[in-house]
Regions:
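Short helix-capping segments at alpha-helix termini
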Residues: 192-197, 313-315, 390
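Short linear capping/connector segments at secondary-structure termini
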Residues: 87-95, 125-130, 206, 321-326
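Residue-level signal for inorganic ion chemistry
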Residues: 30, 66, 88, 110, ...
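ALDH superfamily catalytic-core signature
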Residues: 234-387, 409-411, 416
Length: 428
């Protein structure tokens, strides 16, 4: 079991002003992964101030040297990949093979950006005046606040942290409050690998309400120059509005309701394979998870029959084994997903498993891997007969549920794909 707390200016924060919590393994609820000391708004402001104090000296390090630091981070993460992947599996229940691939994304991100330290080019611009020359330079933004979700607790943060650090910024990173152990482990690898000076990277462990309050206070005090956020569209809208009040543009990666169009000429076996992984990988808890299959009416029956068979045969359960998906990430997502199941109506045909809802001894799934009673495991659900006015069609569901509807013309398929109003991913 790990003890997790905020780390500000290179030093762990000893107290827990917002209390403590014991974070369970979602696949084994009687196993505590971490004892977590929660910070508050003041912790966030302190971290932003530490970042401000450290940023100028970090920016003065030549960009190619910062690039070498990024390269070292990648090598240290690579050397510790299996250990970090096991922690991802333990803390959020992501299948180990998938978790290992996620850790690899950190390494790939470092490998991509390490050379950018030599390519932070400015421009020379022609002037209309004979005695003038115009130049542009790439300068760091300053202090960057990064707030990330826990469904990708190490890969997605690297997409923010690596380029921000390379460019000479100091960072205040707030990982999800249900994946703080992964955040602390990643922080340690970044500081060890990059030899980062104290305060260049700060870790804040807090809930969403305290984080937003701290971010607002820090921005009002002029301590944060840029915000990056991955999470729900509702929270993203609030952060975007806060940034706008300070004339800043936030980097927002939000929710999705992602369609897959299956054409009459499609390879149905390939379509089923894609729908299975996209819809049910990570228990459907990705922003890019498949939401609705929009299938041509001429191949609907055959596709649904094959899809149903594939989902029924899919291994679900213990994430340390070779399953398609494991538990829900956290109890709050399990409760929310149960509300989404209430959107299934009488006009729908429910397929994919021997039941719906939580997998228990009284509501079993054939072929379940492991002990369902001790984890947040849920049946996979296919909802056939979805219409474009259904809540399940229009809204992100964030769980192991995929809708199916039909189309006649390509224009109709495109219209259906765009109707939910999200703009994240799609497949044909």
């Amino acid at each position: 079991m790990r003890t997790v707390s905020s780390i500000v200016g290179g030093k762990p924060v000893g107290d827990a002003p917002a209390g403590t919590l014991a974070l369970p393994n979602p696949a084994r609820l009687d196993e505590v992964v971490a004892e977590v000391g929660l910070g508050d708004a003041g912790t966030f402001v302190d971290a932003a101030r530490a970042a401000r104090d450290a940023q100028r000296a970090w920016a003065e390090v030549p960009a190619p040297v910062r690039g070498r630091a990024i390269a070292h981070i990648g090598r240290v993460v690579e050397a510790n990949a299996e250990r970090l992947a096991r922690l991802v599996t333990q803390e959020i229940g992501k299948p180990y093979a998938e978790a290992l691939g996620e850790v690899r994304e950190i390494v790939d991100t470092c490998d991509f950006f390490l050379g950018e330290g030599r390519r932070l080019y400015g421009q020379t611009v022609p002037s209309e005046m004979p005695d003038k020359q115009l130049f542009t330079f790439r300068e760091p933004v300053g202090v960057v606040s990064v707030i990330t979700a826990g469904n990708f607790p190490v890969a997605v943060p690297s997409w923010y942290l690596v380029p921000a650090l390379l460019a000479g910024n100091a960072v205040v990173w707030k990982p999800a409050d249900y994946s703080p152990a992964c955040g602390q482990a990643m922080y340690e690898l970044f500081v060890e690998g990059g030899g980062l000076p104290d305060g260049v990277l700060n870790l804040v462990v807090a809930d969403g309400e305290q984080t937003f309050a701290g971010l607002e206070q820090a921005m009002d005090a002029g301590l944060v120059d840029k915000v990056g956020f991955t999470g729900s569209s509702a929270v993203g809208a609030e952060i975007g509005a806060l940034a706008g009040r300070h004339l800043q543009s936030a980097c927002l990666e939000l929710g999705g309701k992602n369609p897959m169009v299956v054409t009459p000429a499609a390879d149905l076996d390939l379509a089923v394979e894609a729908a299975l992984f996209s819809g049910f990988g990570t228990a459907g808890q990705r922003c890019t998870s498949l939401g609705t299959v929009i299938v041509h009416e001429s191949v609907h029956d055959e596709f649904v029959a094959r899809f149903d068979a594939a989902v029924r045969d899919a291994a679900v359960g213990d994430p340390t084994t070779g399953v398609v998906y494991g538990p829900m990430l956290h109890e709050k997502f399990a409760r929310r997903y149960e509300e989404y199941l209430g959107w299934v109506g009488d006009h729908h045909r429910v397929l994919g498993s021997t039941g719906t809802g939580r997998i228990t001894a009284d509501n079993p799934r054939d072929g379940f891997v492991g002990d369902a009673a001790n984890g947040l495991f849920y049946h996979p659900v296919i909802v056939d007969g979805v219409t474009s006015d259904d809540a399940i069609f229009l809204n992100e569901t964030f769980g192991p549920i995929v809708g199916v509807t039909t189309y006649r013309t390509l224009d109709e398929a495109i219209e259906l794909g765009n109707k939910p109003g999200y703009g994240l991913s799609a497949a044909i």
